[in-house]
Curated annotation (Swiss-Prot):
InterPro entries the UniProt entry points to: EF-Ts_dimer_sf, Transl_elong_EFTs/EF1B, Transl_elong_EFTs/EF1B_dimer, Transl_elong_Ts_CS, UBA-like_sf
Name this polypeptide is given: Elongation factor Ts
Renumbered residue ranges of the record's region Involved in Mg(2+) ion dislocation from EF-Tu: 80-83
NCBIfam families, A to Z: tsf
CDD domains: UBA_EF-Ts (cd14275)
Length: 279
């Protein structure tokens, strides 16, 4: 039987980031063969990672990347905020979103799934890729991305279209695009415009509001008017274009788009947005 020295264990730990006990066990099973020990660690790690999948992973962070052809956001969860700051965790997320954006994929390849399992094995937490959002950037479009805070617990991507693409260099437009991303981070709209809201959802809300007014004693016509007003207010809360702009709530986002379009002499359109949040 080969003798496993503390120096051997230390070397394997430095190369794999695995725990002391796991490294010692892997070296023993591998008879001191470092490459075989690494393979054993991966096998052991994947097995233990599978066991951790039922543990809550309510922490994590959002990662982003853009290469002017595609852009994307990635939400990776973990169990503790300490791990969300771990350099291995952060490096994995940054590398993964870059690979996904550059390939235009919105799902993990087999090799990427294996990397995820190996990371979970090394860090010893339940780590999961929860959400992937990749969008293609068409001609006359550009994106603005905002990650909130040191731990990037909120990530926002806003894609805009400009009739005159040369205007994307305009500071007013760039500032407005960032303000839009900040707005989405702060108010978390669900839809871009009212027309995107499912008609069945609106009908359900109308029924709820009407039910609340059943005992009010008001006439049917007045109740209909009140319900219509409540629906309008509710849609303004969940539709980005109808929300009061975060930096000037006297104007809606739609009205701010028109103002900035006039100022730079080029029509601006919000094509889509994405909001991801940990927790």
């Amino acid at each position: 039987m080969s003798i496993i020295s503390p120096q051997d264990v230390k070397k394997l730990r430095e190369e794999t980031n695995a725990g002391f006990g796991d490294c010692k066990k892997a070296l023993s099973v591998a008879g001191g063969d470092f490459e075989l020990a690494k393979k054993k660690l991966r096998e052991m790690g994947i097995a233990s990672a599978e066991k951790r999948l039922d543990r809550d992973a309510k922490e994590g962070r959002v990662f982003s990347y853009s290469n002017n052809i595609h852009a994307g956001l990635l939400l990776v969860s973990c169990e503790t905020d300490f791990v969300a700051l771990n350099h291995n965790f952060v490096n994995f997320g940054n590398s993964l979103i870059k690979e996904l954006v550059e390939s235009g994929r919105n799902s993990l390849a087999t090799s990427q799934e294996l990397e995820l399992k190996n990371l979970a094995a090394t860090i010893k937490e339940n780590i999961q890729v929860k959400k992937i959002f990749i969008t293609e950037i068409q001609s006359n479009e550009f994106v603005k991305i905002y990650l909130h805070g040191e731990q990037s617990k909120i990530g926002v991507l806003v894609k805009l279209k400009v009739d005159d693409f040369s205007k994307t260099e305009d500071k007013m437009l760039q500032d407005f695009a960032m303000d839009l991303a900040l707005h989405v981070a702060a108010l978390a709209p669900i839809y871009l415009r009212n027309d995107d809201v499912c008609p069945n959802y609106i009908k359900e809300q109308e029924e709820i509001f009407a039910k609340q007014l059943e005992l009010s004693g008001k006439s049917e016509s007045i109740v209909k008017g009140i319900v219509a007003g409540k629906i309008k207010k509710h849609l303004a809360e969940i539709s980005l274009l109808e929300q009061g702009f975060v930096k000037n709530d006297k104007l809606t986002v739609r009205e701010m788009l028109e103002e900035v379009s006039k100022a730079i002499s080029s029509k601006i359109e919000i094509v889509e947005f994405k909001y991801l949040r940990i927790g």
